[in-house]
């Protein structure tokens, strides 16, 4: 019996040791400066495998970013997402290591970048750390991993990045590389505890790596006499700069920046490299964006530049959609809008990729529309992530605010928060994806937020101030009526989601509020335009547009509204999207395109920038970024109003195509829906309207001929999957 008991105790001890060996720990370097901002460190681990496994999933999380090499091969380029699925938790990656593993000896190396400061899209835990859990092969991060803080990585001097960016300006001192101060790592937490909170699986794919491309450069000088090597990039992109140089001495400071180093009138990311003697290759791993990459160094330097290159990375989706039409200006706009969209997608949606990298929800709604009509469905995950983050950051009092995730911003923009949950936000996402699960998840947050909105004695939406009562850039903003229109659209969205998710008991209250808002809103009609009695500025074109797109204005007012909009141009590129939509809905697509070309003409014609501005000119209001997410909204208007394409049953089970008569006489588009690619082309020959429609399996399209056209007296028809050639003839008045 004693022998049996001893054996049992021994087996328990072995089991405990095995279990302990399989525990993954948050680890960090044993260095007193490990939690300073912009700290870089490396972690190494050698291990042996008896055979090569077929599949090994490693769960990896970090504060803040990591690069992973397995047996010398790069397995992950800039892994990890900026922290903040909610206020306390962290995202983790799932990485398949099997393509890089082999029988026998293996080694892994992790390079960690710790931001160490807050930003408008990142929450710092306050502790640099990484955790790796591939327990199926016995590979877990613990004290057996060797690590060191890399002293070659430093921070550039002033000017520093502005307060919105968690990223710092990286300086790399090449003569300090190759250090060997490796020590056992510190174990400072386990999975799901400590400063990093619970761990949520990464909801979007790893970045697409387009590879390193050698670039042509021009040589010039700046006004200080420095050599400036300028690379004209194919377009405004997210990229990491690379170069190959020889320095006959050492200590030359090579500055690395783009034409967006002061994007939006504030300090953005840049980098420096301090040479060692001899030939050296370097890639600056902090991504930056721009149309022009610049490498700058003193004219006195004994430096030979062998090559300059760059690695473009970005959100992993495809430009599956296409569009071309008979109007070259619109084609050029479309290209710029797509570049503006894509460069504003990474960890989250951005308003701009240089100054802020922040997920403002007014911008997100504009980006969402473009994404659904032109990017592959893999992009939908970024929308879903944005939606989840918005509701998971909801304050205890019910307030929704953006940008999120954020550690140094918590102010509500009431108009943008209403936009996010409106028919242009959450419900719009549902119609394009059919994702009922997400709607069920967000509805309680929608209901809580809407409960904060009250009506005044006249029955109109009360002016909720929030933290920043912003309705649009520019002047003459009739804020009471803008809020009322967004409130109305948010209530309509809430009705839709409530009915979808089994909360019908809430619907009657929403409908009563909508009726009250509509009645009170229309009391503000003066016979020519909508104006709130307390507003004393010029009549606001934004309000007239919102009255139309929300349905608050009936068609009897359209001509007066049209006349008012023709005389007012106060909307910024953000709200101008809704102005064009309103004009098209009222049957004035010709003027919408005329106004569009007038107001967007400068930025479309600009050959220096491949993206669209924040304001109406470079350096305008809001900081004057030359790349801003909200300026591509006309792309969605063209799809939905001129081409007349939109889903009518969630998930594109059914769709409508009702083209408008417009100055665009010929066009073709491919829309990569969740059902497959919907293709539509038309040619307007005056008396004949020809259309070709290719419909994917599982979708029904209801085609309505342009006004004034018919086929054998038929104006409408329902079409199933397949390719359809249609010819309509102009009808006599």
Question: Model-found features: residue ranges?
Answer:
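Bacterial Sec-dependent N-terminal signal peptides
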Residues: 1-22
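Extracellular/oxidizing-compartment recognition motifs
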Residues: 22-354, 363, 378-384, 401-408, ...
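Alpha-helix capping and helix-loop boundary segments enriched in small/acidic/polar residues
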Residues: 32-35, 82-86, 96, 122, ...
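Aromatic-rich carbohydrate-recognition surfaces in CAZymes
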Residues: 99, 108-112, 119, 272-304, ...
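Repeat-solenoid scaffold signature
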Residues: 110-129, 136, 569-598, 607
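Non-catalytic C-terminal accessory modules of carbohydrate-active enzymes
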Residues: 157-158, 162-172, 590, 594-733
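The feature captures the catalytic groove of carbohydrate-active enzymes
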Residues: 267-271, 277-278, 346-348, 352, ...
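Extended, well-ordered alpha-helical scaffold segments
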Residues: 333-336, 379-390, 436-453, 494, ...
